[in-house]
Amino acid sequence: METVVVIVGAGPAGLATSVCLNQHSIPNVILEKEDIYASLWKKRAYDRLKLHLAKEFCQLPFMPHGREVPTFMSKELFVNYLDAYVARFDINPRYNRTVKSSTFDESNNKWRVVAENTVTGETEVYWSEFLVVATGENGDGNIPMVEGIDTFGGEIMHSSEYKSGRDFKDKNVLVVGGGNSGMEISFDLCNFGANTTILIRTPRHVVTKEVIHLGMTLLKYAPVAMVDTLVTTMAKILYGDLSKYGLFRPKQGPFATKLFTGKAPVIDVGTVEKIRDGEIQVINGGIGSINGKTLTFENGHKQDFDAIVFATGYKSSVCNWLEDYEYVMKKDGFPKAPMPKHWKGEKNLYCAGFSRKGIAGGAEDAMSVADDIRSILATLKNN
């Protein structure tokens, strides 16, 4: 099949890219490996998830949220928004298409994308002038290699598989990772009566959603360093010194940290209070080894657990199928070019949703990619 643009991934960034291209009447096809769009939100998000950012930072092009929508949305409200977005713009991804390879054919200056239809088992070949990688930052769940992990006698899961603490009442559960997922899952487990311990390796900023909302609004008018100083000061006033509870604050500000490392500040949902009250235990460092249900930590501490939830992020799988990834990506699956031109590569290869700026970043990428493709096509037409 031939088309002008192939988009790989039907998450928010992929959907937005298709809509933006359609606004310019540019033919495009979305290939999605799952059987539904936005599978991260529809299949892999835990039940109590709420968006930590205000609604104006969680919307896609050409369809802002209405006044009736609360400032901070639940998962259900955002999924409903995505459903309405797909219906309004009549987006029709090709589902159950696992991309096996993508290469640039120098002989005809086109991308050759090979995908497997996992329902029929057939191999499909797509040719396009432009290729957009929109699989996003959250690819495959990352579970680190730990000595003896295969001997663990309890349940092991990645945070993307976690739904609710309902089944963990009275069980000893370790959550590995002190980011937003780890902190929120710990809170949920504790609420359902699990004996919860969270393992935190690196320092993280902890703020309220209101403070981060203020900070993101101010970033439109003030430099990052100034906003970081204000946000950090407010966090100190609200929480005081949390180091005695095992929560350490980085030296670099929250927005600078997010910008340069991709690590977002933790938006507190009530976890800090439970840590202060001793309802959630904190261990700093990493896991040394596992033997049955007994875990030995790097600090020498030993403890038995019934379950481990790895909230240890994701790893990009882009380089596994994008053979010519070096035109836009590094080996870690993130853009080579610095912001704000991170979305544009060579040979008409683009990426959307890799800016480490969440939904808003994916929306910005989508508009930039579509505008650039429109400009290139217009130039070719005039020549």
Curated annotation (Swiss-Prot):
It comes from the Eukaryota. Induction: Up-regulated by drought. NADP(+) binds at G177, G178, G179, N180, S181, G182. It catalyses: indole-3-pyruvate + NADPH + O2 + H(+) = (indol-3-yl)acetate + CO2 + NADP(+) + H2O. It holds the Pfam family Pyr_redox_3. SUPFAM superfamilies: FAD/NAD(P)-binding domain. The keyword Amino-acid biosynthesis does not apply. GO terms for biological process: auxin biosynthetic process; response to ethylene. It is an enzyme of class 1 (oxidoreductase). FAD binds at G9, A10, G11, P12, A13, G14. Its cofactor is FAD. One of its GO terms (molecular function) is flavin adenine dinucleotide binding. Pathway: Plant hormone metabolism; auxin biosynthesis. Its EC number is 1.14.13.168. Keywords: Auxin biosynthesis, FAD, Flavoprotein, Monooxygenase, NADP, Oxidoreductase. InterPro entries: Auxin_biosynth/cation_transpt, FAD/NAD-bd_sf, Flavin_mOase. Involved in auxin biosynthesis. Belongs to the FMO family. This is Probable indole-3-pyruvate monooxygenase YUCCA10. It comes from Arabidopsis thaliana. The gene is YUC10.
